[in-house]
Amino acid sequence: MEYLSIGSPEKKYRLVILTDMENEPDDSQTMVRLLMYSNEIDIEGLIAVTSKWLPRLVFPESITARVNAYGVVRKNLVKHAAGWPSEQYLLDRVAGGQRGYGMSAVGDGKSTEGSELIIKAVDKEDSRPIWFAINAGANTLAQALWDVRKTRSPEEVAAFVKKVKVYDDSGQDDAGAWIAHTFPDLFYIRSRSQVFVLDAPMTAYRRIVMDVKQAI
């Protein structure tokens, strides 16, 4: 089993974040926290997407604002550790995803800056896989996979899918189920309990224990 070791100088993990910024304060808070660890990972995308409670709007400008704030303090961060990405590097990886909810916003002619950024990141000449942390809806990743499946050979699709690893927080639209069903070889983890940690830690703990027992 492979374990993710934060801070390992030999190997940084590649990461794309899908987040429904402006839905709730926790999305902005976790974005700030991520930036405080951005020297430990290779951030490949910061994509504003929709979710159940934010079904029609995306706010990439809110990600941009947090990256701008990171740029202000970066000069202090570099005094303590190496590897901090430049503000411009991160800004170049901010994008907006599907402006609609779930699979209703996925299909031919529905590509977005976010879905195109995903394809570009996965296609990069880099043998490392990309982890997708989906803290909202998954339909922007679904759109990227839709476009790849429509335009490439089965062998090329398989090579693309092999590089994608997903951690999905609670399945906040129907796109995650479509991805898992359509691409059964794609590495996909769904947490059914993470979101409950926000306001009921003990409830979340009990749910996690139940999930583990069911898995065993």
How would you name each of these model-derived features?
Residues E2-I216:
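N-terminal acidic, glycine/proline-rich low-complexity segments
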